[in-house]
From Swiss-Prot:
GO BP annotations, alphabetical order: alkane catabolic process
Pathway the protein contributes to: Hydrocarbon metabolism; alkane degradation
Primary location recorded for the protein, binned into one broad class: cytoplasm
Gene designation per UniProt: rubA
Disulfide pairings: none
Designated name of the protein: Rubredoxin
Length: 54
């Protein structure tokens, strides 16, 4: 599973953990998250995230 980091605020989306607070189940791949989803911390869109190596 991959991780994606917001380039604005640094918040990290981990595919393995999902984001249940927004209804995104653990194991949800980045490409399966709706395009209108926004960063929970700063509100930017998915285009402002980059895949990171951890």
């Amino acid at each position: 599973m991959k991780k994606y980091q917001c380039i604005v605020c640094g918040w990290i989306y981990d595919e393995a953990e999902g984001w249940p607070q927004d209804g995104i189940a653990p194991g949800t791949k980045w490409e399966d998250i709706p395009d209108d989803w926004t960063c929970p911390d700063c509100g930017v869109s998915k285009v402002d995230f980059e895949m990171i190596e951890v």
